[in-house]
Swiss-Prot record:
Protein's job: Required for accurate and efficient protein synthesis under certain stress conditions. May act as a fidelity factor of the translation reaction, by catalyzing a one-codon backward translocation of tRNAs on improperly translocated ribosomes. Back-translocation proceeds from a post-translocation (POST) complex to a pre-translocation (PRE) complex, thus giving elongation factor G a second chance to translocate the tRNAs correctly. Binds to ribosomes in a GTP-dependent manner.
A GO-annotated cellular component: plasma membrane
Keywords recorded for this protein, A-Z: Cell membrane, GTP-binding, Hydrolase, Membrane, Nucleotide-binding, Protein biosynthesis
Species assigned in the record: Bacillus anthracis (strain CDC 684 / NRRL 3495)
Record-linked HAMAP family: LepA (MF_00071)
Lineage of producing organism: Bacteria, Bacillati, Bacillota, Bacilli, Bacillales
Reaction equations catalysed: GTP + H2O = GDP + phosphate + H(+)
NCBIfam families reported for this sequence: lepA, small_GTP
Protein name: Elongation factor 4
Family to which this protein belongs: Belongs to the TRAFAC class translation factor GTPase superfamily. Classic translation factor GTPase family. LepA subfamily.
Compartment(s) where it occurs, according to its Swiss-Prot or TrEMBL record: Cell membrane
C-alpha cells in the first residue's frame, strides 16, 4: 500500500471497547456485533464467543481481554474497519480493562435497563475518561419486564454526567438496536491519529505463548508500519527479533502482509523467552527506532499474597513452568519460591484480589493438571521496630517477635458500595464488623444509595464480598481503591498442633478480634483433623500466651477385653501400660493436616 491508500484506510478505522458491570450483557452484545458484521458463519457462532476460556464460559464472566477485527458497511455506503476489544467487568480485572482502553479511541458503555448504574460501571467509566475516550451510552435489556430505560437514562446523566439523550436503547439478546450502535461507532468514535511514515511504535496490550510459534504479542499500531521480515526491538528490554508473521483476529487468526496505523492485531517473531515481551512495552524498528516509548500503563501491584504448594512435591518444577506461562499474559501476577516446614517447596504468589487468586488456582489445576494446597491469603504490612528500623511483611511467618515491634501499619481501601435502600442497615453492619469507618452516603435516586467506607484491605480479603452478596440478596455492588497505610493494633496468631507450630496456619489478626478468631479456628481444626492414636492438643497462641485450646481425643483399644473378672490391680497394670505407650507415641508422632483445614482458616465466618 502507498501512503494515500494507507491514509484513506486509516480514516475508516474505528477502535472501540465495551465496558459494563458484570452481567449487564457485554459478551452477548459482542456476539451480536460479530453476527451483524458477518464475522462468522452461522455454524461457527456460539454464545459468548469471545470468552474462549472454559472458566469464563462456566462462570459467565470475562477474564482475559480479546480483540477482533470486523468489516462493516455503513449506511453512508462506505466500508469501515472496526476493532472490538472485549474487556472484563470484575473489580479484580480492572488492569485488563485499562489495557484494552489504552488501545482504543471509543468505548460503548453498557448499562442494564433494570438495574441501572453499578459500582464497577463507574470505575470503568472513569478509566475510559482518563484515556480520553469517546463514550457511547447503551441501555441494554430493554425487553425485560422490569426495564425502566428512562430512569436509567436520567441516572447516566446525573451520576456520570454524560449526555444520554442519544443513548441507544437495545436488547443484545433479542438483537434490537445493534445497527444503531454500529452507526454511532462510525459517526462518533474518532479515527486513529498517527502517521504511517513515522518510526514504528506498537503497544503490546497482551501476549500468549504458542508452543510452535513462540510468544505471540497482541499489538495496537500507533505510528509507522510493520511487515514480515522487519527487524524489531522491544524498547523496555532492548532485545531484537525478526518478525515471522503479522495478522489480525477475525476471531480466527488471519495472516496479513503488514499492519499499519490504527491496526489491532498480532505479531510473532519466534520469541522464545516469555520475559522478553512485557505487556505495556513498545515495539519499534531496530534500524529506525522511535525516539521514545509510548506512555505504557503502570505496572499493577498485587494486593493479596498467598502460598501455592503442589500436593505432590515432585511437581514443584511443573508448578514453576505453569506460573511462568500464566504470568506471560497476566501481567499482575507475581511469584517467588518459598518453603514451609509443613508443606515443603512452593511459591509465594501475589494477586490483585480474591477472585483473581481463585481463578488462577483453578487455571493451574485445569490447564496444567497440578493439585495445589493454598495457604491463607495475607496483605502487605509495614512493621516499625523499636530500634528504628522498618520492614515489609507479606507472609505472617516473617512477622518479628512482638517485643521488638513499635507499631504495625496495614493498607486501607476506600470502598464504594452501591446498594438498594432496604439493605443499607445490613451493609453498614457488615462494614462495622470489618473495622470499617463510615465516610459518606449519597442517594443515586429514590431507591439506591452509595455508601463510602474506609476498610482495612485484610478484612476485605477474606469473605467480605461473599457476605455482602448474601446479606443483600446479590443486589449490592462494590468497588475499592487503595488509599494508603494506617497504624492498627495487629498481632500474629500461631496455631500449635501437639505443641508444634504449623507455619502455614499462622495469620495476622486485629487484637480485638484475636480471641474469637482463635476460638473458632481451634474448634474448626478439631472437626477437620482426623483422630490419632494419641491425644492432640490444638492451641492458638499470640507470642507465648495461649488464647484458645481444644483437644482431639485419642482413639484407644479396649485393653481390658481379655481380662475376665480379674483383680483391679491387674486391670490397672494393663491400663497404665497402654498409657505409657500413648505417651511415647505422642512424643514421636506427627499430625497430618488435611487440605480442608487450610481452607477452613481461609473461609472464616465471623458469625
Amino acid at each position: 500500500m502507498n501512503k494515500e491508500e494507507r491514509a484513506k484506510r486509516q480514516s475508516k478505522i474505528r477502535n472501540f471497547s465495551i465496558i459494563a458491570h458484570i452481567d449487564h450483557g457485554k459478551s452477548t452484545l459482542a456476539d451480536r456485533i460479530l453476527e451483524k458484521t458477518n464475522a462468522l458463519t452461522q455454524r461457527e457462532m456460539k454464545a459468548q464467543l469471545l470468552d474462549s476460556m472454559d472458566l469464563e464460559r462456566e462462570r459467565g464472566i470475562t477474564i482475559k481481554l480479546n480483540a477482533v477485527q470486523l468489516n462493516y458497511k455503513a449506511k453512508d455506503g462506505e466500508e469501515y474497519i472496526l476493532h472490538l476489544i472485549d474487556t472484563p467487568g470484575h473489580v479484580d480485572f480492572t488492569y485488563e480493562v485499562s489495557r484494552s482502553l489504552a488501545a482504543c479511541e471509543g468505548a460503548i458503555l453498557v448499562v442494564d435497563a433494570a438495574q441501572g448504574i453499578e459500582a464497577q460501571t463507574l470505575a470503568n467509566v472513569y478509566l475510559a475518561l482518563d484515556n480520553n475516550l469517546e463514550i457511547l451510552p447503551v441501555i441494554n435489556k430493554i425487553d425485560l419486564p422490569s426495564a425502566d430505560p428512562e430512569r436509567v437514562r436520567q441516572e447516566v446523566e446525573d451520576v456520570i454526567g454524560l449526555d444520554a439523550s442519544e443513548a441507544v436503547l437495545a436488547s443484545a439478546k433479542a438483537g434490537i438496536g445493534i445497527e444503531e450502535i454500529l452507526e454511532q461507532i462510525v459517526e462518533k468514535v474518532p479515527a486513529p491519529t498517527g502517521d504511517s511514515e513515522e518510526p514504528l511504535q506498537c503497544m503490546i496490550f497482551d501476549s500468549l505463548y504458542d508452543p510452535y510459534r513462540g510468544v505471540i504479542a497482541y499489538i495496537r499500531v500507533v505510528n509507522g508500519t510493520v511487515k514480515v521480515g522487519d527487524k524489531v526491538r522491544m524498547m523496555a528490554t532492548g532485545k531484537e527479533f525478526e518478525v515471522t508473521e503479522v495478522g489480525v483476529f477475525t476471531p480466527k487468526t488471519t495472516q496479513r502482509d503488514e499492519l499499519t496505523v490504527g491496526d489491532v492485531g498480532f505479531l510473532a517473531a519466534s520469541i522464545k523467552n516469555v520475559g522478553d515481551t512485557r505487556v505495556g512495552d513498545t515495539i519499534t524498528h531496530a534500524k529506525r527506532p522511535a525516539a521514545e516509548p509510548l506512555a505504557g500503563y503502570r505496572k499493577l501491584n498485587p494486593m493479596v499474597f498467598c502460598g501455592l504448594y503442589p500436593i505432590d512435591s515432585a511437581r514443584y518444577n511443573d508448578l514453576r513452568d505453569a506460573l511462568e506461562k500464566l504470568e506471560l499474559n497476566d501481567s499482575a501476577l507475581e511469584f517467588e519460591p518459598e518453603t514451609s516446614q509443613a508443606l515443603g517447596f512452593g511459591f509465594r504468589c501475589g494477586f490483585l484480589g480474591l477472585l483473581h487468586m481463585e481463578i488462577l488456582q483453578e487455571r493451574i489445576e485445569r490447564e496444567f493438571k497440578i493439585d495445589l494446597i493454598t495457604t491463607a491469603p495475607s496483605v502487605i504490612y509495614k512493621v516499625f521496630l523499636t530500634n528504628g528500623e522498618d520492614m515489609i511483611v507479606d507472609n505472617p511467618s516473617n512477622m518479628p517477635d512482638p517485643q521488638t515491634i513499635d507499631r504495625v501499619e496495614e493498607p486501607f481501601v476506600k470502598a464504594a458500595i452501591m446498594v438498594p435502600n432496604d439493605y443499607v442497615g445490613a451493609v453498614m453492619e457488615i462494614c462495622q464488623g470489618k473495622r470499617g469507618t463510615f465516610i459518606d452516603m449519597q442517594y443515586l435516586d429514590e431507591t439506591r444509595v452509595t455508601l463510602t467506607y474506609e476498610i482495612p484491605l485484610s478484612e476485605i480479603v477474606y469473605d467480605f464480598f461473599d457476605q455482602l452478596k448474601s446479606n443483600t440478596k446479590g443486589y449490592a455492588s462494590f468497588d475499592y481503591e487503595l488509599i494508603g497505610y494506617k497504624p492498627s493494633k495487629l498481632v500474629k496468631m500461631d496455631i500449635l498442633l501437639n505443641s508444634e507450630q504449623v507455619d502455614a496456619l499462622s495469620f495476622i489478626v486485629h487484637r480485638d478480634s484475636a480471641y474469637d478468631r482463635g476460638k473458632v479456628i481451634v474448634e474448626k481444626l478439631k472437626e477437620l483433623i482426623p483422630r490419632q492414636q494419641f491425644e492432640v492438643p490444638i492451641q492458638a497462641t499470640i507470642g507465648n500466651k495461649v488464647v484458645a485450646r481444644s483437644t482431639i481425643k485419642a482413639m484407644r483399644k479396649n485393653v481390658l477385653a481379655k481380662c475376665y473378672g480379674g483383680d483391679i490391680s491387674r486391670k490397672r497394670k494393663l491400663l497404665d501400660k497402654q498409657k505409657e505407650g500413648k505417651k511415647r507415641m505422642k512424643s514421636v508422632g506427627s499430625v497430618e493436616v488435611p487440605q480442608e483445614a487450610f481452607m477452613a482458616v481461609l473461609k472464616m465466618d465471623d458469625n
